[in-house]
From Swiss-Prot:
Gene it is expressed from: Cbr3
GO MF terms held by the record: 3-beta-hydroxysteroid 3-dehydrogenase (NADP+) activity; carbonyl reductase (NADPH) activity; NADPH binding; NADPH dehydrogenase (quinone) activity
Binding site for NADP(+): 10-34, 38-42, 63-64, 90, 194-198
Positions annotated to bind substrate: 140
Major place of residence: cytoplasm
Catalysed reaction, written as an equation: a secondary alcohol + NADP(+) = a ketone + NADPH + H(+); a quinone + NADPH + H(+) = a quinol + NADP(+)
The keyword DNA damage is assigned to this record: no
Name of the molecule in the record: Carbonyl reductase [NADPH] 3
Any GO BP annotation: cognition
GO cellular component, one term: nucleoplasm
Species this chain originates from: Rattus norvegicus
């Protein structure tokens, strides 16, 4: 395959919003679309389902919790396409409200995937993003709610325009540590591991966009976070008010921003509208 070929990639794409995003990109993106999933059998079944609809996604295994798996994907993209045009970081987890798992365990597991693993994907794949590339981190307004429920000191730190990636990583580690020591409330944290993980993703988005401006401004890569809304998925126990197709609209809009677009960039977007942070 020619390294001139354009390619879009979606993580956690075998079901739910990720599957709907992949389907829409197959219809609208001019180039190959790679559907990734942790479970190979489920991923290939999802590809077959889209093929039955007349679409032609490719499959590549990806477990975002496994750095080796991320690097294997990076090497595949480099070899097959010479890089990446569109990255949609959709893979993520959430514990159900009534899950009996201790809160500190929920915090560690949720942040491991939703924040740290998503950051690892960005660390490996952002350097191979091609000029005019588009990066979309699927976040949530739960992150904004978590921010509002943080202490004033934490809110100030998360909103600070000079917060570094290292600072953010330290804050996310501190949350996990504080839950283990049962002092997270005293330390100013909210009671939602999912919310804190998505707060981390949104702030990471702001930081990475700033880094792109500093290092690769001429490449005009746009990187944003989005909230798909409360969608009927396994994660929401099918109780959401939106269909997966509706949930995919804003991520796909951000993934397909035209080449001459200069914004949004480093923003949290819902229903195609930038949210106040």
């Amino acid at each position: 395959m020619s390294s001139c070929s354009r390619v879009a990639l979606v993580t956690g794409a075998n079901k739910g919003i990720g599957f709907a995003i992949t389907r829409d990109l197959c219809r609208k993106f001019s180039g190959d679309v790679v559907l990734t999933a942790r479970d190979e059998a489920r991923g290939r079944a999802a590809v077959k389902q889209l093929q039955a609809e007349g679409l032609s996604p490719r499959f590549h295994q990806l477990d975002i919790d496994n750095p080796q798996s991320i690097r294997a994907l990076r090497d595949f993209l480099r070899k097959e396409y010479g890089g990446l045009n569109v990255l949609v970081n959709n893979a993520g987890i959430a514990f159900r409200m009534d899950d009996p798992t201790p809160f500190d365990v929920q915090a560690e597991v949720t942040l491991k995937t939703n924040f740290f693993a998503t950051r690892n994907v960005c660390t490996e794949l952002l350097p191979i993003m091609k000029p005019h590339g588009r990066v979309v981190n699927v976040s949530s307004l739960q992150g904004l709610k978590a921010l509002e429920n943080c202490s004033e000191d934490l809110q100030e730190r998360f909103r600070c325009d000079t917060l570094t990636e290292g600072d953010l990583v330290d804050l996310m580690k501190k949350f996990v540590e504080d839950t283990k020591n049962e002092v997270h409330e005293r330390e100013g944290w909210p009671d939602s591991a999912y919310g804190v993980s998505k707060l981390g993703v949104t702030v990471l988005t702001r930081i990475l966009a700033r880094q792109l401006d500093e290092k690769r401004k001429a490449d005009r890569i746009l990187l944003n976070a989005c909230c798909p809304g409360w969608v009927k998925t396994d994660m929401a126990r099918d109780q959401g008010s939106r269909t997966v197709e509706e949930g995919a609209e804003t991520p796909v809009y951000l993934a397909l921003l035209p080449p001459d677009a200069t914004e949004p960039h480093g923003q949290l977007v819902r229903d195609k509208v930038v949210q106040t942070w």
